[in-house]
Amino acid sequence: MLNEIDPFRQRLLRAVFGGEVTGHDGEHIDDLLQTPVLPDVMVMNPPFASSVDRSRDKHIAAKHLIAVAKRLAPGGRLVAIMPPGFTPERDTAHWSRACGLLTPRLALTMPGQVYRKLGTSVETQLMVFDRVQEDCEMIRAIVCDLDEAFSSVDAVAATRTEERPAQRLAAVPQALQQ
């Protein structure tokens, strides 16, 4: 399932992946999707500063993350590029809501220079969350470049179980799935 609100990026996604690309406002994605699909893995890069109506909203990325988290399958993984202000210290209310749905695994602060070739220089966080109810310590680090990020990303990747949510569902007798 692919969702992108920008028409140009929608066309790119169709060209690369084929199939349908929805154009929903990600802030309301869980309410707007008609299908009961619960993806195992979601990757997102939400807007950092403004909503669809272009009003300024410093919490818009957090609102997108929470909406996506509601749609993620139990046991699933969410990888997000988030603004540096999305932390338990700087955005307590949204962080608490997100952590009511997800377990944070990784928060890597990345300097804007990483994206210079792509025409932007905004500092970001690469974040990984799992939809599981377990206590674990989130890896928090500041990296200078992508090469430095690999060891932290690999460490978090190793925490993902081999059995995916869809596999667990397939193992449940049909009568119990309803």
Q: Residue spans of the language-model regions?
A:
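Conserved NAD(P)H cofactor-binding loop of Rossmann-fold oxidoreductase domains
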Residues: P46-P47
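Conserved SAM-binding strand-loop segment of SAM-dependent methyltransferases
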Residues: G18-H28
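Short, hydrophobic beta-strand segments that form beta-sheet elements in well-ordered domains
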Residues: M1-E4, V21
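A short acidic, Gly/Pro-enriched loop at the edge of an enzyme's catalytic core
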Residues: L32-V43
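Conserved SAM-binding loop
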Residues: L13-R14
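Flexible, glycine-/basic-rich loop-and-beta segments that form/coincide
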Residues: V114-Q177
